[in-house]
Amino acid sequence: MKPLAVTLGDPSGIGPEIVAKAWSRRKSDQIMPFFAIGSAASIQAVSSIPVVAITDPNEAISIFDQALPVWDIPSKETITPGKPNKAGAEVAFAALEKGVALVKQGQASALVTAPVSKAELYQVGFTFPGQTEFVANRCGIAADDAVMMLAGPDLRTVPLTIHIPYRDVLEQLTPKLIISRARVTVEDLKRNFAIPSPRLVVAGLNPHAGENGTIGREEIDSIEPAIRQLQAENIDIKGPFAADTLFSPRARATYDVALCPTHDQALIPIKTINFDNGVNTTLGLPIIRTSPDHGTAFPLAGKNKADEGAMVAALVMAANSAHNRQAYAQNSIDG
């Protein structure tokens, strides 16, 4: 398989540090070869690991055991850990463009993206709500057809609505949206995670899942019709269930992924249960994309205090997903 492509994110954040630390765990965690894309200087500013510049992803395979291969995108200004600037945002933007292009061209097996600062990116022409929507756009996929899934060793969740105010959730949470997100989720749990018959559950929006309409009708008017349609398509999906009881160990054993009406319903349990190794992966794309489920953490940058666990988990998930998708495609041909 081709190496993984890993963007460094904002070079003033913890991205360079966690990528360097992940490379240092390449043997103990059996991480497949990868190359970083971004400012090589930003890695050298926070780590003493050996770095080798490359101009061809194929070079990464032979270099990886001895040094971190880097597709260098130099900054126009000095990069200072913890102090983001426009030049750093330009590097992060360019790295993301390059990473998507290389994976689309088949020169890398999957894309792993370190955290960026959207506030900084907006200063240099970035117009998307986040990296998920950017990657979908560059892959020719409508934003509504790209599904964010958060995953850890103990739980997977999908937020049905993402970065919108709560007052807008009621309008966006339609049967059409739920059905679309569920279909994409089922397909990629099969392709990327080798789960032949995915089990889905849906959380209610209102307290106690609406109490049969006495605390809101979203469950009756939007969620239940979607579930009935999906069940008619032979998808294993149940709900709506009260969100406050859906994430206990006993409940989690009954499903493979929980679809959650709101952003925080999906992210709070992941960050509570799997804070140090949660991964954000985008479903519905022609490529594999994962990301550690945390931000740039500018106050930690340059202090050697950043935990690389989520980056390691994102690398492992990307490699496994690429392998599973390849096997799924081959089985489809053979079958």
UniProtKB/Swiss-Prot annotation:
UniProt keywords, alphabetically: Cobalt, Cytoplasm, Magnesium, Metal-binding, NAD, NADP, Oxidoreductase, Pyridoxine biosynthesis, Zinc
Question: Might you name a Gene Ontology BP term for this protein?
Answer: pyridoxal phosphate biosynthetic process
Q: Which InterPro entries match?
A: PdxA, PdxA_fam
Q: Is this entry keyworded Magnesium?
A: yes
Name its species.
Zymomonas mobilis subsp. mobilis (strain ATCC 31821 / ZM4 / CP4)
Keyword Nucleus assigned to the entry: answer is no
> Lineage, please?
Bacteria, Pseudomonadati, Pseudomonadota, Alphaproteobacteria, Sphingomonadales
The first-level EC class reads: oxidoreductase
Gene3D superfamilies in alphabetical order: Isopropylmalate Dehydrogenase
Q: Can you say what this protein is called?
A: 4-hydroxythreonine-4-phosphate dehydrogenase
UniProt-listed Enzyme Commission number(s): 1.1.1.262
State where substrate binds: T132, K271, N280, R289
Its annotated pathway?
Cofactor biosynthesis; pyridoxine 5'-phosphate biosynthesis; pyridoxine 5'-phosphate from D-erythrose 4-phosphate: step 4/5
Where does it live in the cell? Cytoplasm
Listed under subunit, the entry gives: Homodimer.
Q: Name one GO cellular component term.
A: cytoplasm
- Select a single GO molecular function from the record's annotations and give it: magnesium ion binding
Its function, per the record, reads:
Catalyzes the NAD(P)-dependent oxidation of 4-(phosphooxy)-L-threonine (HTP) into 2-amino-3-oxo-4-(phosphooxy)butyric acid which spontaneously decarboxylates to form 3-amino-2-oxopropyl phosphate (AHAP).
